[in-house]
Amino acid sequence: KMTPYSENGSPLILPAKVSKQSYRPAQSNIPNDKQVRVFLKKLVSNYVGKTGVVPPIGIKELREHAVAVLKEARLEGKYENYTAILVSNQAWRDTLAQIPYDRRLLLLPKCLRVEERCPAPFDEFGLLCKECGLCSIQDLSVEAERLGYAVLVAEGSAIVRQMIETGKIEAVVGVSCINVLEKCFPHMEAAAIPGVAIPLLQDDCVNTTVDLDWVWDLIHLTSDDK
């Protein structure tokens, strides 16, 4: 391959290829239109600021807030669980921002990979990314590790509980389907660990997609962002 050069003769450093997700429609209990999801997220941000919601929040209270937001948004009640996650994220946002990167865990699901072409093996902790560039797992995990995060590409609530119990993790940034997030919630609530979660747009466990810009935002979140 020829190396490209700038006008002054120095070699150009090209950015790494950014992996793209194939478009897939969202499951029925998540708004399919990205603009609607962004609108809902902004509405949640305003609502939490206005009502002064303070974490940790029990699941019953979260659902009440979600119902209030959906009523204001004039959106269907089937989005209640999704909206409850957005409310919880917004409530924990300032707390997460205060926690150093090296005390945070990034938890990614293996189903973000391109399953039929992924070369990565598994061990007892989860997927061992080979950094092939086919999916977003490489970009997210490499950047998070550069910042100081512990990173796991694994499923389920048991891993989260184990990491919390080590005492080395003070916050969790997770990407997962709504079903798994609901199972993890009691462990997070019991430990009063700040946890933010970006829901996968599908829960069928194969070649799933996520709002990647939201994941990047939360990975980089610091107190300097205020």
Regions found by a protein language model. Give the residues of each.
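Electropositive, gly/pro-rich neighborhoods at or near active sites that engage anionic ligands
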Residues: 1-110
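Redox- and metal-dependent alpha/beta enzyme cores, enriched for Fe-S-associated oxidoreductases
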Residues: 96-149
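Short His-Asn-centered micro-motif
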Residues: 108-109, 152-156, 173-178
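Short, structured coil segments at secondary-structure junctions
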Residues: 147, 191-193
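A short, acidic, amphipathic alpha-helical segment used as a generic capping/interface helix at domain edges
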Residues: 156-165, 180-181
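Short, charged, surface-exposed secondary-structure boundary motifs
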Residues: 163, 182-187, 204-211
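Proline-aspartate-enriched helix->loop->beta-strand connector
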Residues: 168-169
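Ser/Thr/Gly-rich flexible loops in soluble cytosolic domains mediating phosphotransfer, phosphorylation
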Residues: 194-226
